[in-house]
C-alpha cells in the first residue's frame, strides 16, 4: 500500500513537496531528513485502527545531531534532562491495540514541536528575525520557545547565538 505525504520544502513553508512512501501493514514508516540523513519521526500504524485517537511522543527523541551537540555548552546527558525520556517505549504497543503512534526522533532541546512554528526568542539569534516570527510569549520569556534557550533546570544550551537560517531549517 502506498501513502502520499506532503511536507514543507523550506523553513518558510511556502512550497510543499509530495512524497510517495511504501507503507506495509503493521510496520512503521519513517520520513527521512535529506540533509542529515536522520529520520525525523516514526509513525507506527495498527493493522486495523479501532479508535479515533492518535498517540504521540513529541519529546522523547534521542537522536542528537553532531552539529547541535557541538553548538551546545552542555553535554548530551545534560541536554537529555529536557526529554520525556522513554515515553515512546511506554507507548510502543499502542498500534497492537488499534491506535496509531507518532514519535519524534529528535530531542525537545533541538526543536519543540508543541510550540507555535515560529515562537522564537530574538536574543538567541545574531541576525534579525523575519516579521512573521512571534517574539513574545510566556514560553519565550521562560526560555522555552520553539527552539529552547535553556534546558529544564534553567541552564543555557548554546555557546553563542545561532543563525535565523538554522532556526527556520529546524
Describe each model-derived feature in a short phrase.
Residues 2-170:
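N-terminal catalytic or cofactor-binding beta/alpha core of small enzyme domains
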